[in-house]
């Protein structure tokens, strides 16, 4: 492999391509003369669009094909949305860089209403995320929630066609695709706790590829890594996946980190919440400790019930 060339495996969706183009531009800015190639490909999660994510099941729906490309030396790195990245990596691969986080909140998108509280009784809301469904149902049990799959453009088209009164999307995706004007309002983390890693971009590569790791190093954003490590550690201890409503959100003030987490019933009938504060350098320990607290408060029975049905 040329010392001056790097190949990026990416999904084909507009948002995934934006993320890959962002990494490409950063590498070209930091390393003048470098040749960066994009290798767009489809993943299982991109192909199976007629089934709710929770039913498709399995971890790594949006990353496996990219990982195979790296293991086969067809690509040097893969760029991921962190909320899609499983906890465990195939042997020989690892998460080398986490880039600076975009807005991690959920966005309320509607052509008719400004917020969830403004929605009329029995309004239809689109989201495929059990985490979002759980929190919406807890505050507005009257709303009808319908599954919503596809890329951002497809989801917006379904809203515009009148299939939904409102849809919930990650704010980061809309901002990156220059679609901020579609956001009727941002949903605060207090109202809808984000998914772990939401809004952050991660870069995976072969762990023994020192050339590539050196090229990637300047893209690392340490504060984002601490936040995402804590959120992922909580999720790992809870053995979270698409089938369970789990939210995790870390914030940093100076050297202190505050991590909030929740586990809920998909129907919103029960939500277990917790919060923990400690040194940001102990991000992983904080995540595990908060998970243990949630389990002791009753999250274990919720998780056991959900996985028994899966």
Swiss-Prot record:
Q: Which GO terms describe its biological process?
A: protoporphyrinogen IX biosynthetic process
**Residues recorded with modification S-(dipyrrolylmethanemethyl)cysteine:** 242
Q: Does the keyword Metal-binding apply?
A: no
Keyword annotations: Porphyrin biosynthesis, Transferase
Cofactors needed by this protein, per the record, are:
dipyrromethane
Q: Which domain of life is it from?
A: Bacteria
CDD domains linked to this entry:
PBP2_EcHMBS_like
- This protein's pathway: Porphyrin-containing compound metabolism; protoporphyrin-IX biosynthesis; coproporphyrinogen-III from 5-aminolevulinate: step 2/4
Any single GO molecular-function term of the entry would be:
hydroxymethylbilane synthase activity
Its cellular-component GO annotations read:
cytoplasm
**Xref: Pfam families:** Porphobil_deam, Porphobil_deamC
In the Enzyme Commission scheme, what number(s) does this protein have? 2.5.1.61
Extra facts: The porphobilinogen subunits are added to the dipyrromethane group.
Q: What biological function has been recorded for the protein in this entry?
A: Tetrapolymerization of the monopyrrole PBG into the hydroxymethylbilane pre-uroporphyrinogen in several discrete steps.
Question: What quaternary structure, including any partners, is listed in this protein's UniProt entry?
Answer: Monomer.
Record's family? Answer: Belongs to the HMBS family.
Please give the name of this protein: Porphobilinogen deaminase
Annotated organism of origin: Shewanella baltica (strain OS223)
Taxonomic lineage from the root:
Bacteria, Pseudomonadati, Pseudomonadota, Gammaproteobacteria, Alteromonadales
């Amino acid at each position: 492999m040329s010392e001056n060339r790097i190949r990026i495996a990416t999904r084909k969706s507009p948002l995934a391509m934006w993320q890959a183009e962002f990494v490409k531009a950063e590498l070209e800015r930091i390393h003048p003369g470098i040749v960066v190639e994009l290798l767009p490909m489809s993943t299982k999660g991109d192909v199976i669009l007629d089934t709710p994510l929770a039913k498709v099941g399995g971890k790594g729906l949006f990353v496996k094909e990219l990982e195979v490309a790296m293991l086969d030396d067809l690509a040097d790195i893969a760029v991921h949305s962190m909320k899609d990245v499983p906890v465990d990596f195939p042997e020989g691969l690892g998460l080398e860089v986490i880039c600076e986080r975009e807005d991690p909140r959920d966005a309320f998108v509607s052509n008719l209403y400004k917020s969830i509280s403004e929605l009329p009784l029995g309004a239809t809301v689109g989201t495929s995320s059990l985490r979002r469904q759980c929190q919406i149902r807890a505050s507005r049990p009257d709303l009808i929630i319908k599954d919503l799959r596809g890329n951002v453009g497809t989801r917006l088209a379904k809203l515009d066609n009148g299939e939904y009164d409102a849809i919930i999307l990650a704010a980061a995706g809309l901002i990156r695709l220059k679609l901020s004007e579609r956001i009727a309002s941002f949903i605060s983390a207090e109202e809808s706790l984000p998914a772990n890693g939401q809004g952050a971009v991660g870069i995976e590569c072969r762990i023994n590829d020192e050339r590539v790791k050196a090229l990637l190093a300047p893209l690392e954003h340490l504060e984002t890594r601490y936040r995402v490590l804590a959120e992922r550690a909580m999720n790992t201890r809870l053995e979270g996946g698409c089938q369970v409503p789990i939210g995790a959100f870390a914030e940093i003030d100076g050297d202190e980190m505050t991590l909030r987490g929740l586990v809920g019933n998909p129907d919103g009938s029960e939500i277990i919440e917790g919060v923990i504060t400690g040194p940001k350098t102990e991000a992983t320990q904080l995540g595990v400790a908060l998970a243990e607290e949630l389990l002791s408060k009753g999250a274990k029975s919720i998780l056991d019930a959900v996985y028994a049905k899966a």
